[in-house]
Structures are given as structure tokens and as C-alpha cells.
């Protein structure tokens, strides 16, 4: 049950250092945890709200009615952070919504210095940086404009204050990781769920690897 409190609680029980999750903004302005553009795949939304209703068109009252399985509900950003902090660093992936709203909510919760906010939309990150320079930012890639994190890309990221380069694992090389470190950024990869990928991440000198199987990854790393 991805992006639910039971999933976050299970990861917290493993004492993981970082928890990555997805957030979108509702029509009412609330920020909730969901990956897709609608709730159909991860809940009974097709039955409750009608198939294909966009997240951005929903209200929080509507979302509260959804069942993600075994009674789990769609959590708000605030509810997710309550589970993760202080044990893990929340790695919040912006999937949709306004920079102003994210900054407002993180400041209201008093966690601006305890989370990392990442996005594939670097214009969103630039807006966040202008509003809240204290927020740690992660740049996800590749994207349609930037295929690889070369010197030019890393200079751009440093220019608006990004602290994390988070790249797709099969598009990331040792040189990219070295360039990121030389520019003062951490180098993360997504998403590796097999030992071969974890071994490669270690060889590349990555600072973190996102996985859907943290228990197996912990077992592997303890014997690496």
C-alpha cells in the first residue's frame, strides 16, 4: 500500500535513514500523499468518486472517503511527516501543486529544516528556493531538457541552491556522481530493488539509493 501510513510505519520500524514519498495538491489546497494523477490504482476511487477523477479536482472531504486497502486512508503531508519524524528524513517528491502552497505548509508545520523537497520540475524548485532558501532541494532527472547531469547542469542546480542530485539509476555513472560531489551535491539514485543495482550504487559512490524493498537492501548492505 504505497504512500499510506501503514507503509510509512513499516519503513520507520526498519529505522531507515530516508523515506521517499509522493505529494500532490488537491483542489481545496490540501497536500496529500499519492503518486498518480488520480487515485484509481491505489484506492477504490473509481467506485467512490468515478473513474479517472484527477487528484487536482478532489477535495479533502472526498479523499477521506477512499480506502487504499485494509482500511488504510490517503494521508495528508502532515500525517506522513508525523510518522517519519524524527526517525527518518522525509524526502518529499512534488508530483503536483504550487510551490507557494508547499512552502506555506512546511513552514506552518515547522519542518522546513528537517525535510528534503525534490521534483522533476526544476522551475518549481527555483520558485521554492526563492521563497524559502533554507529548504533542502533535490533535483530529479533525467527530464526532457536535461539528459545527463554534466558540469552545466550541476552549475545550474547549485545556482538555485539544490543540495541533492537524484537521478535514474541506469542513467547515472561514476563520473556523474563525482561531478555532483565536486559541486557540493549529494548523489542519489532511483529505483533499485535488486542486489546487482545496490552493488553498482556502492561502486559509484552514491550517498543513497531509493528502493521498494528496504528490508532486503538493509540485509544486503550489512553484508556488503
Predicted regions and their residues:
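Metal-dependent phosphodiesterase/phospholipase catalytic core, i.e.
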Residues: 28-30, 35-144, 160-163, 167-170, ...
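Short acidic catalytic loops
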Residues: 17-26, 95, 201, 209, ...
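Conserved N-terminal beta1-alpha1 strand-loop-helix module at the mouth
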Residues: 1-35, 48, 114
Amino acid at each position: 500500500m504505497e504512500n499510506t501510513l501503514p507503509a510509512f510505519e513499516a519503513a520507520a520500524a526498519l529505522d531507515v535513514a530516508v523515506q521517499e514519498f509522493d505529494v500532490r495538491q488537491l483542489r481545496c489546497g490540501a497536500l496529500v500523499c499519492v503518486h498518480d494523477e488520480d487515485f484509481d490504482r491505489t484506492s477504490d476511487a473509481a467506485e467512490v468518486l468515478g473513474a479517472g477523477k484527477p487528484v487536482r479536482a478532489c477535495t479533502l472531504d472526498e479523499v477521506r472517503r477512499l480506502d487504499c486497502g485494509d482500511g488504510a486512508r490517503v494521508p495528508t503531508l502532515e500525517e506522513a511527516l508525523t510518522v517519519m519524524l524524527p526517525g527518518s528524513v522525509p524526502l518529499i517528491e512534488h508530483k503536483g501543486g504550487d510551490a507557494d502552497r508547499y512552502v506555506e505548509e512546511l513552514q506552518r508545520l515547522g519542518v522546513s529544516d528537517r525535510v528534503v523537497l525534490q521534483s522533476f520540475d526544476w522551475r518549481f524548485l527555483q520558485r521554492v528556493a526563492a521563497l524559502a532558501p533554507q529548504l533542502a532541494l533535490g533535483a530529479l532527472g533525467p527530464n526532457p531538457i536535461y539528459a545527463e547531469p554534466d558540469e552545466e547542469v550541476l552549475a545550474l542546480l547549485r545556482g538555485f541552491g539544490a543540495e541533492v542530485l537524484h537521478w535514474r539509476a541506469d542513467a547515472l555513472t561514476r563520473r556523474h556522481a563525482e561531478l555532483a560531489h565536486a559541486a557540493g551535491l549529494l548523489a542519489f539514485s532511483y529505483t533499485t530493488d535488486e542486489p546487482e543495482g545496490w552493488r553498482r550504487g556502492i561502486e559509484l559512490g552514491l550517498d543513497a539509493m531509493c528502493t521498494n524493498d528496504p528490508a532486503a537492501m538493509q540485509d544486503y548492505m550489512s553484508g556488503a
